[in-house]
UniProtKB/Swiss-Prot annotation:
It is an enzyme of class 5 (isomerase). Belongs to the PhzF family. The lineage of its organism: Eukaryota, Metazoa, Chordata, Craniata, Vertebrata. The gene is PBLD. One of its GO terms (cellular component) is cytoplasm. Its EC number is 5.1.-.-. InterPro entries: Phenazine_PhzF-like. GO terms for molecular function: isomerase activity. The active site is at 46. This is Phenazine biosynthesis-like domain-containing protein. It comes from Pongo abelii (Sumatran orangutan). GO terms for biological process: biosynthetic process.
Amino acid sequence: MKLPIFIADAFTARAFRGDPAAVCLLENELDEDMHQKIAREMNLSETAFIRKLHPTDNFAQSSCFGLRWFTPASEVPLCGHATLASAAVLFHKIKNMTSMLTFVTLSGELRARRAEDGIILDFPLYPAHPQDFHEVEDLIKTAIGNTLVQDICYSPDTRKLLIRLSDVYDRSFLENLKVNTENLLQVENTGKVKGLILTLKGEPGGQTQAFDFYSRYFAPWVAVAEDPVTGSAHAVLSSYWSQHLGKKEMHAFQCSRRGGELGISLRPDGRVDITGSAAVVLEGTLTV
């Protein structure tokens, strides 16, 4: 069997930045275990599988598809950058002419629509609630040592722990912070936490571009030590920072080595629009 496959760098307009995701187009149903084997072979933080929902569907003309995401270790319920990569492949490489795509996923229907400055993802907005420090003290100390922490919240919907670093730190500190992910699986093995968000309040622009907040994201529980740019984490971050900054429109930067920018707009219906660009850097055929 031969499958069309692509790699797209998401949340960037330039190759070799942002977050790379593999995108596989499925004309027919794939054996269940083959999804995981392909994701392991691609060895990226996520591999997306776009499937037709009806035999008469066409990747170039239809507007609604099934979408699943796999890390090298397991299937995940939501992945922003691989959704953006999937939309970019359909819009820019397959030349799908619809103005909006709908993806049927484990997290419900997600929509991606064209915009002048990229692609807009319509995502759920997940609240984060205050978390008692002592319950997660070992996890925090293991990950970031004695780094000063200003706030801790937990998102039960996504099982992500959000740690806001002290406002005394700047972007450079977050970028250079050494985070110990190797021992997190031993410290947190209850299943409560599946992802760790570190975040920091933004700074005035000055000579550099202004961002409302910065972040990094770690998910060793699903075999992703650090994810370069994470749309699903921003479905939590958007809720948190909107409350603390009193803003509905925000500009975010994820401070991984590759780095990526996200535009954020909270909607009246309780969801969030996340805007980003994507660069398709590889296209080929996978033989299985």
